[in-house]
Amino acid sequence: MSLTNIMPGYNALASVLTQQGVAMTPAEMHGLISGLICGGSGDRWQTQVHDLTNEGIAWSQTLAQPLQQLHDATSNALEDDGFLFQLYLPEDDDISVFDRADALAGWVNHFLLGLGVTQPKLDKVKGETGEAIDDLRTIAQLGYDEDEDQEELEQSLEEVVEYVRVAALLCHDTFTRVSAPTNVVMKKPTLH
């Protein structure tokens, strides 16, 4: 089952977001929800999305239903060892590489926002995950030159998208996986 079969359509979600007065793209909303999930928000995600996007007020069913769909599909993809998890970026043939790069930057910015809400001490995270978070901060600020070769930019963009995907999976693994307790009972040595 592919992720696109259970996600709301990108353009349909864009239309609903606009109709509901939400100044976010579907990529940004997916980044926010992904950040919340990867940070371990659990059942609080809806309240957090309402707080961050609508002054704490719940959305109408017209928007709540596709957002629930987006959350569930994303959560399921992340829990499936991440193999199905993909960034929700515009894919249409008429979307330029520059628009996709802008969508990626928006996704990353909102991912970091969601992650920061659930993990307020992100700057203290060390190791591989800390490095990935620092890289995401840099990626969120990347720009491009419209005079660049579009094929070369497209290839570079795909590599960055894959890196961001793996960084998100690493964050999910770091912040949501609880190490399993061991069943081994250590016995203290007995003195005879």
UniProtKB/Swiss-Prot annotation:
Highest taxon of source: Bacteria
UniProt GO cellular component terms: cytosol
Gene3D superfamilies given in the database record: YgfB uncharacterised protein family UPF0149, PF03695
Family that this chain belongs to: Belongs to the UPF0149 family.
Protein name stated in the entry: UPF0149 protein ETA_28040
